[in-house]
């Protein structure tokens, strides 16, 4: 072979080796960057798993003015407890009901600022049951208040309502053998619009949100669209009970709170023996048909919820939700032992943690503190699991004392047992 051809062949081989080497180095570099992508946030557009830190730098000030519309049978008691504990840690005033309203703001009447106990005004937060009235809430709350609520899938919610209020709602009491299936087979045979506690038997979500629960989207689609528009105008976040931890991640980010601020113990949960393990498909369809207004609300806000998660970065939200669950389990173990379990009220020794029982047919579960505990940690754990009525009573006494109404210090352990529901509350006179 001529010398010139030999030199050309050697040059070609060297170039091929360089290309191969560069290709290997390039692949290795890209592989390393992808591997580090979930930990490095230097180029978020290329690596979507790069998530914002839990604590912003510089940190935003935590938002203190929050109004939570506590809807019925939607995990609202757990959210309320989160807000109550945050308010206590930051010495905030929580709006609480006038004594004649008991522990709700004279529900099911439309909310009025007159229903708020004078010792708890002006408030930073509000989280007790009420029927939404925008004008009255804006009259009461600070101008920078962030409004939040929570919805639950209507079939599951209705099963819970039917079980929980079976002894109080006449429409449910009329049903033979307290059968949900019998009621949903012919709901008009048992339901009477406008009677005592009727709102628990038909479109309860719509009623809580201030809507007309007797309207049907099948007959008036414009009404549902208008109600959705009203909710969107007011509420910065509509949480979804089925995705509770993801909802708390969005809430934490909205309010610029820390992860520790949204840790929780599950409250007001029924025992397995008091609920259907699964709702048959036909029964779920019947429940959604009967509660069509609620179904329309839920379907819309469930869709907007996931669009919001997508904007925040679904992988990032899921990662933070996992971190929340892990931190929550550590907290529960520290407070309630290595294997914290929900217990029937009869097995809870600490009276302040015994949840109210709506009837003999329904067991509401709770936690108990290990014996021998004392000190700040015990008090924090007590509040973590404290039922709504006891916590509301405690906060009212504490805020009265802060306002000079009472001078004797109140103990967190000094809580009377909750009273049963008897009748509609009276309207308080004056302010």
Swiss-Prot record:
Pfam families, per the entry: Gal-3-0_sulfotr
UniProt biased composition (Low complexity): 421-431
Cofactors: Mg(2+)
Keyword Magnesium among UniProt keywords: yes
Subcellular location, record wording: Golgi apparatus, Golgi stack membrane
Record: glycosylation sites: 91, 110, 177, 302
Similarity comment text for this entry: Belongs to the galactose-3-O-sulfotransferase family.
Protein name, as recorded: Galactose-3-O-sulfotransferase 3
The species this protein was found in: Mus musculus (Mouse)
């Amino acid at each position: 072979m001529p010398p010139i051809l030999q030199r050309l062949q050697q040059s070609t081989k060297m170039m091929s080796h360089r290309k191969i080497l560069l290709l290997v180095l390039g692949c290795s570099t890209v592989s390393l960057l992808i591997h580090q992508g979930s930990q490095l946030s230097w180029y978020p557009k290329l690596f979507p798993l790069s998530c914002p830190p839990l604590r912003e730098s510089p940190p935003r000030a935590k938002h203190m003015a929050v109004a939570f519309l506590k809807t019925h049978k939607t995990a609202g008691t757990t959210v309320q407890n989160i807000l109550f504990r945050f308010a206590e840690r930051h010495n905030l005033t929580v709006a609480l009901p006038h004594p004649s309203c008991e522990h709700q703001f004279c529900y099911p009447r439309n909310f009025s600022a007159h229903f708020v106990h004078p010792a708890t005004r002006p408030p930073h937060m509000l989280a007790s049951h009420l029927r939404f009235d925008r004008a009255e809430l804006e009259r009461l709350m600070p101008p920078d208040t962030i409004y939040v609520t929570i919805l639950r899938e209507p079939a599951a919610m209705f099963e819970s309502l039917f079980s929980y209020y079976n002894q109080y709602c006449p429409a449910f009491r009329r049903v033979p053998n307290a059968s949900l299936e019998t009621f949903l087979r012919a709901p008009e045979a048992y339901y009477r619009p406008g009677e005592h506690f009727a709102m628990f038997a038909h479109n309860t979500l719509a009623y809580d949100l201030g809507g007309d629960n007797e309207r049907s989207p099948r007959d008036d689609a414009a009404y549902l669209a208008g109600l959705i528009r009203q909710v969107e105008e007011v509420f910065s976040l509509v949480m979804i009970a089925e995705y509770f931890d993801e909802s708390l991640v969005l809430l934490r980010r909205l309010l610029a709170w820390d992860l520790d601020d949204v840790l929780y113990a599950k409250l007001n949960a029924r025992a397995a023996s008091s609920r259907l393990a699964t709702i048959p498909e036909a029964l779920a369809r019947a429940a959604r048909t009967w509660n069509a207004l609620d179904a329309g609300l839920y379907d819309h806000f469930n869709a907007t919820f996931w669009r919001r998660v997508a904007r925040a970065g679904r992988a990032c939200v899921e990662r933070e939700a996992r971190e929340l669950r892990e931190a929550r389990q550590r907290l529960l173990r520290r407070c309630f032992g290595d294997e914290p379990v929900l217990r029937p009220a009869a097995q809870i020794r600490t009276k302040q943690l015994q949840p109210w029982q709506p009837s003999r047919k329904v067991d509401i579960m709770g936690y108990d503190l290990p014996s021998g505990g004392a000190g700040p940690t015990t008090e924090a754990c007590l509040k973590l699991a404290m039922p709504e009525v006891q916590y509301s009573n405690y906060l009212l006494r504490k805020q009265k004392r802060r306002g000079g109404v009472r001078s004797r210090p109140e103990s967190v352990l000094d809580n009377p047992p909750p009273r049963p529901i008897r009748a509609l509350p009276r309207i308080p006179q004056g302010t």
